[in-house]
Curated annotation (Swiss-Prot):
Cofactor, how bound (note): Binds 1 zinc ion per subunit.
Function: Catalyzes the sequential NAD-dependent oxidations of L-histidinol to L-histidinaldehyde and then to L-histidine.
Keywords: Amino-acid biosynthesis, Histidine biosynthesis, Metal-binding, NAD, Oxidoreductase, Zinc
Top EC category: oxidoreductase
Catalytic activity: L-histidinol + 2 NAD(+) + H2O = L-histidine + 2 NADH + 3 H(+)
InterPro entries referenced in this protein's UniProt entry, alphabetically: Ald_DH/histidinol_DH, Histidinol_DH_CS, Histidinol_DH_monofunct, Hstdl_DH
Organism the protein comes from: Rhodopirellula baltica (strain DSM 10527 / NCIMB 13988 / SH1)
Lineage of the species this protein comes from: Bacteria, Pseudomonadati, Planctomycetota, Planctomycetia, Pirellulales
Coiled coil: none
Protein's recorded name: Histidinol dehydrogenase
ATP-binding as UniProt keyword: no
Source taxon at top rank: Bacteria
Cofactor(s), names only, from the UniProt record: Zn(2+)
Length: 460
């Protein structure tokens, strides 16, 4: 049920990119790409004030993260609790940091039965897809006496970051934990801010219990990432950290990479919608607003139909008044949104590849022909009846995706993200003798005579 909300007039930039010689259009699109690129220097006025209060001086976000990580690494639980108090306003102890199992059970008991039933169905969808794509061991015998295997082993212990600032995200628990469970991860630790939308949120805790997660900690931000990476008395170290978060979480994950593995360096959520004259303007506008309400969230329409662009602009204005978070979506559209007019479908695909968006939605008569021309997107949604929200909540692939143009080389989270691959090689004596001289020749050319000797000693 929608309600009418008073939203001030909004503006969204329109870009006519049809003229290849237009420097203005090229510069506008380049500036938008730069806005969406991973940055370590963008922080709100409130964030700057809090930094000054906690650290006693103005620090960049990167400097804040480096300080927090260093302190947690050297001081352990004491630093974790101190930063949880100063940054999140929660005074906890080593005993109250972890959510008791009784609280998880209690949250599950009072949760909306409809939510629990929904979690069950979504879990089946996610598990079905993730199981289907899971890597299996592969063994080949290229010649007699030789066995070559690529084996996959689940990462033993994983940490999951769940946001909890402006909203509760049980979907993030599902989209990270279920792929990990499908992969066979033994231990899963969830961290969430000590807020009403985080580790004190009934729906989030009930989701954890329904999925069999027993480790949930009331901490967030860079201090939680550092604790999971380095380990402390109250929170044992993990092997990999996944999940979304704010700028400080993203920078902290980047900082601890190498001590542990991470999924990606995530920024604001983003979508590009490619649409033609067959698209429903109301549908397109709703899809753009679905990303914009993340705030910050980027929403870009690329079309070669000028009348559709005009209709979508009108629909955005109308639908903003129906959204509870309409003011946030309006600001995001103003800062990170665009309506782009392309020359044709091929040009739209070129522009899309230049952004390498997190989400790509194609609302055209023949979406399959366009997706074949696009190389860079985290997740693609084809047709008029496949909104991104399906992928956010229920379809099966994980909604944890690379952003800020990193889809050019990074992949979204999946069950395979929680596997470590390794090879297993076995030769019998005859097979070794057949290849021995090749190994010896290369080893001697490199001056590694001990390598060569380890072969020849077995074949002489």
């Amino acid at each position: 049920m929608f309600r009418i909300v008073a939203v001030p007039e909004f503006s969204i930039q329109t870009v006519d990119a049809r003229d290849p010689s237009s420097s203005e259009a090229a510069e506008t699109l380049a500036a938008l790409r730069e806005k969406l690129s991973p940055r370590g220097d963008l922080v709100s006025p409130r964030g700057r004030e809090l930094t000054l209060k906690v650290f006693g001086k103005a620090l960049s976000p990167i400097e804040v993260v480096e300080t927090i990580c260093k302190d947690v690494q050297s001081q352990g639980t004491e630093a974790l609790l101190r930063y949880t108090k100063s940054l999140d306003g929660a005074e906890l102890t080593a005993d109250t940091l972890r959510v008791p199992e009784e609280d998880l059970k209690a949250a599950h008991a009072v949760a909306d039965p409809k939510l629990i039933e929904t979690i069950g169905r979504i879990r089946d969808n996610i598990a079905t897809f993730q199981s289907a794509i899971l890597h299996r061991d592969v063994t080949i015998t290229p010649r007699p006496g030789v066995s070559l295997t690529q084996r996959y082993v689940p990462i033993p212990r994983v940490g999951i970051c769940v946001p909890g600032g402006a909203a509760a995200y049980p979907s993030t628990v599902m989209m990270t934990a279920i792929p990990a469970q499908v992969a066979g991860v033994d231990e899963i630790a969830v961290v969430a801010p000590p807020t009403p939308f985080g580790a004190y949120n009934t729906d989030m805790l009930a989701t954890c219990h329904e999925l069999g997660i027993k480790e949930v900690y009331r901490c967030g931000g860079a201090q939680a990432v550092a604790a999971m990476a380095y380990g402390c008395d109250a929170l044992p170290a993990v092997d990999k950290i996944v999940g979304p978060g704010n700028l400080f979480v993203a920078l902290a994950k980047k900082h601890v990479f190498g001590t542990v593995d991470i999924d990606s360096f995530a920024g604001p959520s983003e979508v590009i919608v490619i649409a033609d004259e067959s698209a429903n303007a109301a549908f397109v506008a709703s899809d753009l607003l679905a990303q914009a309400e993340h705030s910050p969230g980027s929403a870009i329409l690329i079309t070669w139909d000028e009348s559709l662009l005009t209709s979508v602009q009108a629909e955005l204005s109308r639908q903003l008044g129906e959204l509870e978070r309409g003011d946030l979506a309006r600001d995001a559209l103003s800062d990170f949104g665009a309506l782009v007019l392309a020359r044709d479908a091929d040009h739209a695909c070129e522009l899309t590849d230049s952004f390498a968006p997190e989400h790509l939605q194609i609302e055209t008569r023949e979406p399959e022909s366009l997706i074949a021309k696009i190389r860079h997107s985290g997740a693609a949604f084809l047709g008029h009846h496949t909104p991104v929200a399906l992928g956010d909540y229920a379809a099966g692939p994980s909604h944890v995706l690379p952003t800020g143009g990193t889809c050019r080389w990074a992949a979204g989270l999946s069950a395979n993200s929680f596997l470590r691959s390794g090879s297993v090689t076995q030769f019998d004596q005859s097979a070794l003798s057949a290849i021995a001289q090749d190994v010896i020749t290369v080893a001697e050319k490199e001056g590694l005579t001990a390598h060569a000797r380890s072969i020849s000693i077995r074949t002489e």
